[in-house]
């Protein structure tokens, strides 16, 4: 087998194929050998084929420490490289020995006679036919790489096949979350047919400056506040229909709802992004453009929601996936002031597991679908935090009378 290592033996030399300095013309002490044992190059002795390398196992050519099974024999890196270069460059016809081809080859003398070293390689069983030329080496490495990639793909398929799907209890949790979403999601799947586009004139009127440097079109702001109360009410109704939420203390329920309300409303708007008209549909009824939403009070938060909508379009989420994402947002145990942290963590863990197993069941074609989708949860948390900051600035510049009571109740006193 052609080795992949290019490591050189510490006692080998790049001059293995070059001429060697003259030595005294007398037989060396180690030159006595049996001519029979060093017969013609065609002599082949079966190579030693161990199942594994034992500690300090010697090279069968020179006795140095072997590094592996090379060209059908256990050899060191030096003899492996010498044999490979000799065959690849067809150097052996030019090799000669000054001592009648009877040199003993060991760790010390191996570089002193190329012919005897090569004859020793052949005599112990190193196979010339296993040495590949450059084109075959490239082809072999390409084949190895292709096989490696093939194994990776097969392993990925096996991994996908063993990913757990929802069990009976999780299917029930999924069903109830999906029902909760469908019963509280305005217009359902017919939102495109029932939406009404906000007039282009709205969002282009006189602007009132805010303390954060942005400006607000009060006419657009008024339009948006009209749909805020029913939108917030639907989020509350969704939470009440969710398994486990009603079992939490009332104080914790209120904290969780205040924390997730903008996040869930943003998600519901983002999944109704229409690339053709470049609009988001709010509360299932009002289609708005980016600038209208921005000038109507959301400022930079508008950009974040529109960008999320564009990003989510490729995920092709169904009602169940949207419902489970909302449940995960709702059951966030890091909201300030919660008392039942452990129970809320357990609730979120249950929804996360059901969510992940449902994703496995759906078998999306997008690579790394699950971690990418979880990143969208992080994006929604950021949108919620940005909106809390934006609301503080709006409240400074705009009269409280402009805000619906439920809007104030939910978004006042939020952490920024």
Curated annotation (Swiss-Prot):
Amino acid composition bias (Polar residues), ranges on this chain: 1-13
GO biological process terms held by the UniProt record: cell differentiation; negative regulation of transcription by RNA polymerase II; positive regulation of transcription by RNA polymerase II; retinoic acid receptor signaling pathway; thyroid hormone receptor signaling pathway
Region feature Modulating, mapped onto this chain: 1-58
Chain intervals with Basic and acidic residues compositional bias: 15-24
GO CC annotations, alphabetized: RNA polymerase II transcription regulator complex
Top-rank taxon: Eukaryota
DNA-binding region, residue range(s): 59-133
Gene3D superfamilies, A to Z: Erythroid Transcription Factor GATA-1, subunit A, Retinoid X Receptor
Similarity annotation: Belongs to the nuclear hormone receptor family. NR1 subfamily.
Role of this protein: Nuclear hormone receptor that can act as a repressor or activator of transcription. High affinity receptor for thyroid hormones, including triiodothyronine and thyroxine.
Name under which the protein is recorded: Thyroid hormone receptor alpha
Organism of origin: Hippoglossus hippoglossus
Gene: thra
């Amino acid at each position: 087998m052609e080795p992949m290592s290019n490591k050189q033996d510490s006692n080998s030399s790049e001059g293995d194929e070059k001429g060697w300095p003259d030595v005294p013309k007398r037989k060396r002490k180690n030159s006595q050998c049996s001519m029979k044992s060093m017969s013609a190059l065609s002599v082949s002795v079966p190579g030693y084929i161990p199942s594994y390398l034992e500690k300090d196992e010697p090279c069968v050519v020179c006795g140095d420490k072997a590094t592996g099974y090379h060209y059908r024999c256990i050899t060191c890196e030096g003899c492996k490289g010498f044999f490979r270069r000799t065959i690849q460059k067809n150097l052996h016809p030019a090799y000669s020995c000054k001592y009648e081809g009877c040199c003993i080859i060991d760790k010390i003398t191996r570089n002193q006679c190329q012919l005897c070293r090569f004859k020793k390689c052949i005599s112990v069983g190193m196979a010339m036919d296993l040495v590949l030329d450059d084109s075959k080496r490239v082809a072999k490495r390409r084949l190895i790489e292709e096989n490696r990639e093939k194994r990776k793909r097969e392993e990925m398929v096996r991994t996908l096949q063993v990913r757990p799907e929802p069990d009976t209890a999780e299917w029930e949790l999924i069903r109830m979350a999906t029902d909760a979403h469908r019963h509280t999601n305005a217009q359902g799947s017919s939102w495109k047919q029932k939406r009404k586009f906000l007039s282009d004139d709205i969002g282009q009127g006189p602007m009132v400056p805010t303390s954060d440097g942005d400006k607000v079109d009060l006419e657009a702001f008024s339009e948006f506040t009209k749909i805020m109360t029913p939108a917030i009410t639907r989020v509350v109704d969704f939470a009440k229909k969710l398994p486990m939420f009603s079992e939490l203390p009332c104080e914790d329920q209120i904290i969780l709802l205040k924390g997730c309300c903008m996040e869930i409303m943003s998600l519901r708007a983002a999944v109704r992004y229409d690339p053709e008209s470049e609009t988001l549909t709010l509360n299932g009824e009002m289609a708005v453009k980016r600038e209208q939403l921005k000038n109507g009070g959301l400022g930079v938060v508008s950009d974040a929601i529109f960008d999320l909508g564009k990003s989510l379009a490729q995920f092709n989420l169904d009602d169940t996936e949207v419902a489970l994402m909302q449940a995960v947002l709702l059951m966030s145990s890091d909201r300030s002031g919660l008392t039942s942290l452990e129970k809320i963590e357990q609730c979120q863990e249950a929804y996360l597991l059901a969510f992940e197993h449902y994703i496995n069941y759906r078998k999306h074609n997008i690579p790394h679908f699950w971690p990418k989708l979880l990143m969208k949860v992080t994006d929604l948390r950021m949108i919620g935090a940005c909106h809390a900051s934006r609301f503080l600035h709006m409240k400074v510049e705009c009269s409280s009378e402009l805000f619906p009571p439920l809007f104030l109740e939910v978004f006042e006193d939020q952490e920024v």
